[in-house]
Amino acid sequence: MSNNGSSPLVLWYNQLGMNDVDRVGGKNASLGEMITNLSGMGVSVPNGFATTADAFNQFLDQSGVNQRIYELLDKTDIDDVTQLAKAGAQIRQWIIDTPFQPELENAIREAYAQLSADDENASFAVRSSATAEDMPDASFAGQQETFLNVQGVDAVLVAVKHVFASLFNDRAISYRVHQGYDHRGVALSAGVQRMVRSDLASSGVMFSIDTESGFDQVVFITSAWGLGEMVVQGAVNPDEFYVHKPTLAANRPAIVRRTMGSKKIRMVYAPTQEHGKQVKIEDVPQEQRDIFSLTNEEVQELAKQAVQIEKHYGRPMDIEWAKDGHTGKLFIVQARPETVRSRGQVMERYTLHSQGKIIAEGRAIGHRIGAGPVKVIHDISEMNRIEPGDVLVTDMTDPDWEPIMKKASAIVTNRGGRTCHAAIIARELGIPAVVGCGDATERMKDGENVTVSCAEGDTGYVYAELLEFSVKSSSVETMPDLPLKVMMNVGNPDRAFDFACLPNEGVGLARLEFIINRMIGVHPRALLEFDDQEPQLQNEIREMMKGFDSPREFYVGRLTEGIATLGAAFYPKRVIVRLSDFKSNEYANLVGGERYEPDEENPMLGFRGAGRYVSDSFRDCFALECEAVKRVRNDMGLTNVEIMIPFVRTVDQAKAVVEELARQGLKRGENGLKIIMMCEIPSNALLAEQFLEYFDGFSIGSNAMTQLALGLDRDSGVVSELFDERNDAVKALLSMAIRAAKKQGKYVGICGQGPSDHEDFAAWLMEEGIDSLSLNPDTVVQTWLSLAELKK
């Protein structure tokens, strides 16, 4: 397959490796690298061959078309859209009209005959691989063409010709000029690869790192039905999975979070082929939309392949995968360096200071906030309407949109997931984007001012009006030593990977309420008694629990995912999870909750915390929480997760709740389990030594302790000004608790708001000898550095 003994015109993938980027481009070199080096490690890549850069250059040279191309490009003003479009179209037509040199055509025919020998009906993907395309510093996101379901050698030859021509797409020409690449220095290789029949199954994209935070201990997988182009283009909202690498390495269940996408359409093979019509897009049946497109076992298998690929390349990777619908086998069809996340030492924290009316919501890309007037763009022909600072609102984007995307203050799309084109480019440009909103183009109106917030977790929100927000930057190399541990309070698992990148020594308070409220939203009793609910309520709950086998499994499974995400994000550091501390009015606000909750005058002092856990009316609901903790600790092996019991009023109640935990399979000391008590009622401090007999330590809740010590309601505007954790009475109680724990050699920390708000209070706690301060994430760095200054 060479040219009269000179350099080869066609090479098989198993002849290639990363040293061949100059010959076959990054994409093809990477496929060869994996076939050659990773096949024995469980990484499956479909076989194929590649035309070389030499073949491309000879094709242009022998025909003389290269002179015409470069002369035309040299006199074209590529910033003039009309000139660029005219020149690009002319160049592509020249290439398509130029016949292949006989040596190249024969080499392709010969390779095709070998590749299709076992199946004359086999179909192939013909993809471009530019010699500079997948360099780590250049994300040429999809600038050249891909042809799918190509059958027969003549169709392959036509597709290769179109791939060659795609090196001169308008966007590719523009990108090279702006990035400083010489047109003459970039060549194109066409990869011809046996297709995986994912049109009959599912496919998607995965990253060996969390794309939003740069957290490198998880694999992030997206998946949808049909061929993978829909996920890559952002035409569907895919399913999402996070897999924890250390747990996976221990051969334990390692999926820490699953999110079901709508998956409304899919790309499949067209029944009768015409050129350019080898595939078609169709609606996905409702029953397939309502289930995950991968099993848990398949998710774990893909994650293992991602880890092997990352380990081999020695860097985070962006990987496309496909499942064969005939055999059920999982294949890797592309792998390239992950181009976006190289997290520096400077951290930015965006904070929204007020919340307005929500106009649209979708998947948050990045953690920034942007604001400005809306421009709804329905078609690329309208791109000249975008002014710098506008909020770009559209159905979805493709690489043709890049020139206007960089002008936008934020991007909002109807369709797409975290690995779609709009998401990749938004990350690259550092612009906040909310993708997969469904109907943003209908709900948002041209000219209206909006604020686009990606600073609130996985969900991004578009708010009416321009809202006030701030950004804090902090540069952190290494943090100074302190005589205590600086931990943090985390409620939202969506933010856990991001917060884990801050300096920290674990989580002193992880609240279960956020998980129950946002990830579940249904009263546990309504799920346990699902069959007794009204049909309308049953339908509402069924809609919420898609992807789970039963109402009970929905509650336990979602809790497990939330707790596991927190445990995995900070692993192996300590993560203290406080079991549910909803008050009766808060439980009543959950779907189906009203019929099960008492109407209390003062829920703050009512049916809550430990008293709820041991009551006959709630005991089996509490058992669901215990089951989730057991799965996280015993099945997944995240034994860094400890549990904390809130609002323990009496010593008898302390004894009863520890006995109940043991009955539920959470026995203190077993498998290293530590049980911490929330010290937040004056009785807890006054009888600290007696309470500590049943627990492994205290975590001081200074908010409740202050309210109860001073007898005030801090939510009442009339008396709230008296609320101060630094009051002498409160400090006396805290001193008692700290001394009692120290005397018994047990842990004592604080997780209340006080040390986050008042650095002098944090300093006092340090002098008292407290073991840890658990702070709000936005105050960790500043408080840590301030305390270090005081110690000097």
Segments from the language model and where they lie:
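N-terminal beta-alpha lobe that positions the nucleotide/phosphoryl donor
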Residues: 1-191, 200, 286-297, 302, ...
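Extended active-site and interfacial segments that coordinate phosphate-rich ligands
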Residues: 141-174, 198-273, 333-363, 407-414, ...
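Acidic, glycine-rich flexible loop/linker segments
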Residues: 66, 326, 338-343, 347, ...
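Alpha-helix C-terminal capping segments
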Residues: 34-38, 210-213, 407, 423-431, ...
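Conserved metal-phosphate-binding beta-hairpin within the catalytic cores
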Residues: 142, 314-339
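Conserved catalytic alpha/beta cores of large enzymes that bind or transform nucleotide phosphates
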Residues: 218-318, 323-324, 363-370, 388, ...
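Conserved alpha/beta-domain cores
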Residues: 112, 120-125, 130-140, 147-148, ...
